[in-house]
Regions:
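Juxtamembrane intracellular "pre-TM" segments in multi-pass secondary transporters
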Residues: 26-69
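Short amphipathic helix-loop junctions that connect adjacent transmembrane helices
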Residues: 83-102
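A membrane-interface helix-boundary motif in multi-pass transporters
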Residues: 1-10, 215-234
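Helix-to-loop junctions at the C-terminal end of transmembrane segments
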Residues: 118-131, 217
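Structural signature of the two symmetry-related core transmembrane helices
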Residues: 134-149
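Intracellular juxtamembrane helix-capping segments at the cytosolic ends
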Residues: 172-186
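A late C-terminal transmembrane helix in Major Facilitator Superfamily
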Residues: 189-219
Length: 248
C-alpha cells in the first residue's frame, strides 16, 4: 500500500513538472479584438439578459430534447449496473468480498480495453459514413444486451460479459453521442448554453441511478430486478435517439 502511494505521488509530481515545462507560451490576449468585444458585451449585459440566457431552448428544439432524453435514459440505465457492481457481485452473484474485488478488477480491465477499441473505431466510422444517430442507437442496443446477460447468468462470468459487451457498446456511444448533440443544437448563437443543458443529462442520470436502485432493492429485496429495468431504460434511450429527424 505504501509503495503504491509513493509511486502515485512521484507520477503526479513528474507529470505536473513536465506539463509546466512544455506548456505552450502564448502572449496575453488582453488587447485582442475578441477580448475587447467580450468586455463590451459584459458591460452591456443586464439582469434580464442574464436570466434569459439560462432559459432552455423553446424553438426548433424537438430533436434537442429527444437527444437529451436519450442520453439521460442511457446514463441512468448504465449507472444502475456499473455503479453497483460490488453489491451485485456479493448480493446477487453470491461472491465473497475477496472474489468480488478480484472480479471487479478484471471487469475494469475488460471494459477499459473494449471501450478504447470501440471508441477509436466508431468515431472515424461515423465520420466516414456521415451517420450519427444510427451508430449511437446501435451502441445503446449493445449496452442493453450486455446489461441483460446477468439476468440469465447470475455469476462472475455473466458480469464479465456485461463488462465486455456493455463496455463495447458504451465506447461506441460516447465516441459519437457528443457529435450527435452538436448536430441537434437549435441555435448556434446559444450553442454553449444548450450543450451545457445536454451535458446535465450525465449528472442527472448519475444522481437518479442511486435513487432508482435504492427504491427497487427496497421494494423487491433483491438486485435481480435492476437488470430488466436498466435494459428498458437503455432501449428507451435508443428509441428517443432514433426519433431524431435532423440527423441521419
Amino acid at each position: 500500500m505504501g509503495t503504491g502511494f509513493a509511486i502515485g505521488a512521484v507520477l503526479f509530481a513528474v507529470t505536473g513538472i513536465v506539463t509546466v515545462l512544455i506548456w505552450p507560451r502564448e502572449r496575453s490576449s488582453a488587447a485582442s479584438v475578441a477580448s475587447v468585444e467580450f468586455s463590451d458585451a459584459i458591460a452591456k449585459l443586464d439582469v434580464k439578459q442574464l436570466l434569459r440566457s439560462f432559459i432552455p431552448p423553446t424553438k426548433n428544439c424537438r430533436d434537442f430534447y429527444f437527444a437529451l432524453m436519450g442520453r439521460l435514459l442511457l446514463i441512468l440505465g448504465w449507472n444502475m449496473i456499473s455503479g453497483y457492481q460490488l453489491y451485485i457481485l456479493q448480493k446477487y452473484c453470491g461472491l465473497s468480498v475477496k472474489d468480488s474485488a478480484a472480479t471487479i478488477s478484471t471487469m475494469s480491465v475488460i471494459s477499459m480495453v473494449v471501450l478504447i477499441v470501440t471508441s477509436m473505431v466508431s468515431g472515424p466510422l461515423s465520420d466516414r459514413l456521415q451517420r450519427r444517430k444510427v451508430i449511437v442507437a446501435i451502441g445503446s442496443v449493445i449496452i442493453a444486451i450486455g446489461v441483460a446477460i446477468p439476468c440469465f447468468m447470475p455469476n462472475a462470468l455473466g458480469m464479465m460479459l456485461f463488462a465486455g459487451i456493455g463496455g463495447a457498446g458504451y465506447g461506441i456511444y460516447i465516441a459519437v453521442d457528443q457529435a450527435l448533440n452538436v448536430d441537434v443544437l437549435p441555435s448556434q448563437e446559444e450553442a454553449g448554453k444548450d450543450l451545457g443543458i445536454l451535458n446535465l443529462a450525465n449528472t442527472v442520470g448519475q444522481v437518479l441511478a442511486p435513487v432508482v436502485v435504492g427504491a427497487i432493492v427496497l421494494a423487491t429485496g433483491s438486485y435481480a430486478a435492476l437488470f430488466p429495468i436498466a435494459v428498458v431504460a437503455v432501449l428507451l434511450g435508443a428509441v428517443f435517439i432514433m426519433l431524431i429527424r435532423k440527423v441521419k
